[in-house]
């Protein structure tokens, strides 16, 4: 691909870890690990605002509807669920150690979270975000994608 723009995030928070377009294409969200923030950009990549997160935001993704924005805050061992439009925090869910990336299943019935230092993939209900299962004894799982493509921190389906 072609480089569209370089954005200096140093004043806002360093170490961008994830970027996702909103399903409607009007915004981008960026997780800033060394600022414990989400950076909201417009479609021309202008910074609009930052929103505080738990410690260590990493994986970031919207659900298909754009109503929810999820952030895996690995240092806090939390999954944060934000309102996809207002970016107000709606729910915090305890998760495992070093949970970096996640994906919804294609039907969005479940959310799968790769938890590296817990050596497992957590299976959460896709609506309540309660833990419904575990895939254990894995060797440092870092990322996860679903097939057919789904909404997640490493994949994007429309």
Q: Across the structure, where does each feature detected by a protein language model lie?
A:
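Predominantly soluble domains enriched in secretory-pathway, periplasmic, or organellar proteins
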Residues: 1-158
């Amino acid at each position: 691909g072609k480089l569209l723009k370089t954005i200096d995030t140093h004043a806002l928070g360093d170490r961008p870890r994830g970027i996702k377009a909103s399903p409607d294409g009007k915004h981008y969200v960026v997780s800033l690990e060394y600022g414990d923030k989400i950076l909201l950009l417009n479609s021309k990549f202008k910074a609009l605002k930052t929103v505080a997160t738990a410690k260590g935001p990493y994986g970031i993704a919207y659900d298909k509807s754009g109503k929810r924005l999820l952030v895996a805050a690995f240092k806090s061992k939390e999954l944060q669920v934000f309102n996809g439009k207002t970016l107000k925090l709606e729910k915090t869910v305890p998760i495992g150690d070093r949970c970096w990336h996640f994906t919804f299943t294609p039907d969005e019935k479940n959310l799968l979270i790769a938890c590296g230092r817990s050596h497992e993939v957590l299976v959460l209900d896709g609506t309540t975000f309660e833990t419904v299962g575990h895939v254990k004894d894995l060797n440092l799982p870092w990322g996860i994608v679903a097939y057919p493509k789904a909404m997640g921190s490493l994949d994007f389906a429309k």
